[in-house]
């Protein structure tokens, strides 16, 4: 398995190469040069696997044996998921009205990102220790990514992590999960802007090849292929758990998956699984920040003038950068076309998809947009019907379930991306109550540490100097 850039300028890279990369040198994102195919026979053979076992099978498709041997791979996955609070790391809950919810939030920071982040961090540690090297991780977050990334590398001597979050645009718990991480290898910045504003200097820093090489700078955002790879496993797990049977022959039942969508990494993983041969009907669900919905419906891939703050802050995103991977997949790997499209979008923040590409997109993906009122409505109804509380992001998917009956002969799954415990304001707005677990209650009592990125500051230069100071400290 080799990897290439979505913009055609880089080919033939190893898994290790892309693991330690942010964006490719040409500004693109890494993808497998060829996707493996999953036959009906293979899916049947995986039917009784646990999530952990299935994840190993998936990773083996994309990580050659000579890079991480199977025995070591199994050990890394097992160790990565050892701190999750349920036995198999994920849990499927089946409720009234054919509502099935795949809970992906049982990691230490109570968000689905813990699954891919913990595995990716263990893969990093494997190579860094083997090669006796160090790395600096640079991460921008809209809420959940930052704390998950910090937790995955907390205290590792081989890694420093720099995390930037948008001040005032995430929940208090999300902020405290980052700022109370005062380990020597953790560096947290609060920026006076949106998560999309944060992405701009980060992309520029990753485009500086000399900076990346000198400081071994890398990303744990979903620009990192490893995150997408791991996320493909929960789509496969949902399919194998919820399809009633896999009859002999090549005709397989369909599973509809409703996916809360922000940066589009999760929905990209779903599309990859679909392209590998699994019959998924994918629905990207967004909040008022509806660029993905508009793109699917009309081909209008254009940013709004500002990011709207909603009750689902982790998907308050107007620049869903993983859509570049989707465009590359659907164009048949036409990197030159993707390069042209994305350079236009990055320059003007507006793009009208070519008709053929929009048609391809609308054939593989449906979409919907939900207001804050709809989020609260879904939270209330799910509680009233089931005494089951969902977070506002999960509610974006569950709202669609309540509005649209399941098609005859099909099954459906809603992806639960975070625990409701992290979103007390939304829970209270819905007229519901939820007692915080002790791990969150104590956050207010802990020491915090955070640096500022003010509107008047040069964010790129400030972060560049900090990255250089980290390397200087290491080498002293």
From Swiss-Prot:
GO terms (BP aspect): 2-oxobutyrate biosynthetic process; brain development; larval locomotory behavior; serine family amino acid catabolic process
Family membership noted in the UniProt record: Belongs to the threonine synthase family.
Cofactor: pyridoxal 5'-phosphate
PROSITE patterns: DEHYDRATASE_SER_THR
Modified residues (N6-(pyridoxal phosphate)lysine): 113
GO molecular-function terms, A-Z: lyase activity; pyridoxal phosphate binding
Function of the protein: Acts as a catabolic phospho-lyase on both gamma- and beta-phosphorylated substrates. Degrades O-phospho-threonine (PThr) to alpha-ketobutyrate, ammonia and phosphate.
Superkingdom classification of source: Eukaryota
Alphabetic keyword roster: Lyase, Pyridoxal phosphate
Record-annotated membrane-spanning stretches: none
EC code(s) of this entry: 4.2.3.-
Name of the protein described by the UniProt record: Threonine synthase-like 2
């Amino acid at each position: 398995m080799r990897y290439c850039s979505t913009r055609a300028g880089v080919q033939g890279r190893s898994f290790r190469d892309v693991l330690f990369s942010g964006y490719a040198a040409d500004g693109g994102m890494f993808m497998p040069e060829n996707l493996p195919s999953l036959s009906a026979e293979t899916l049947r053979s995986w039917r009784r696997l646990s999530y952990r076992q299935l994840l190993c099978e998936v990773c083996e498709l994309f990580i050659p044996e000579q890079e991480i041997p199977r025995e070591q791979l199994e050990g890394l996955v097992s160790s990565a998921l050892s701190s999750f609070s349920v036995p198999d790391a994920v849990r499927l809950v089946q409720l009234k009205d054919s509502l099935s919810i795949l809970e992906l939030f049982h990691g230490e920071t109570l968000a689905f990102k813990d699954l891919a982040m913990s595995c990716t961090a263990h893969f990093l540690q494997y190579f860094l220790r083997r090669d006796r090297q160090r790395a600096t991780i640079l991460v921008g977050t809209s809420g959940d990514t930052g704390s998950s990334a910090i937790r995955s590398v907390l205290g590792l001597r081989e890694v420093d992590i720099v995390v930037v979050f948008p001040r005032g645009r995430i929940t208090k718990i999300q902020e405290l999960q980052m700022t109370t991480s005062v380990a020597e290898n953790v560096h947290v910045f609060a920026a006076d802007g949106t998560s999309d504003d944060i992405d701009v200097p980060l992309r520029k820093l990753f485009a500086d090849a000399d900076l990346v090489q000198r400081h071994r700078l890398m990303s744990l955002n979903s620009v990192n292929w490893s995150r997408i790879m791991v996320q493909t496993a929960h789509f496969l797990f949902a399919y194998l758990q919820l399809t009633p049977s896999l009859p002999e022959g090549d005709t397989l039942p369909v599973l509809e998956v409703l996916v809360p969508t922000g940066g589009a990494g999760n929905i990209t993983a779903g599309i990859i699984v679909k392209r590998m041969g699994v019959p998924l009907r994918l629905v990207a669900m967004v909040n008022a920040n509806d660029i993905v919905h508009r793109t699917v419906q009309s081909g209008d891939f254009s940013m709004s003038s500002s990011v709207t703050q909603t009750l689902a802050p982790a998907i308050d995103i107007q620049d869903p950068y993983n859509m570049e991977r989707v465009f590359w997949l659907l164009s048949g790997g036409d990197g030159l076309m993707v390069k042209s499209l994305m350079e236009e979008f990055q320059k003007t923040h507006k793009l009208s998809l070519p008709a053929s590409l929009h048609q391809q997109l609308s054939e593989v993906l449906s979409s919907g947009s939900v207001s804050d009122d709809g989020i609260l409505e879904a939270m209330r109804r799910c509680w009233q019907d089931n005494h089951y509380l969902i977070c506002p992001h999960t509610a974006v998917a569950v709202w669609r379930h309540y509005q649209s009956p399941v098609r005859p002969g099909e099954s459906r799954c809603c992806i639960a991306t975070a625990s409701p415990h992290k979103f007390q304001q939304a829970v209270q707005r819905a007229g519901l109550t939820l007692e915080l677990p002790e791990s969150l209650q104590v956050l207010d009592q802990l020491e915090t540490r955070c640096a500022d990125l003010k509107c008047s500051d040069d964010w790129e230069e400030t972060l560049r100097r900090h990255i250089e100071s980290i390397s200087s400290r290491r080498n002293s």
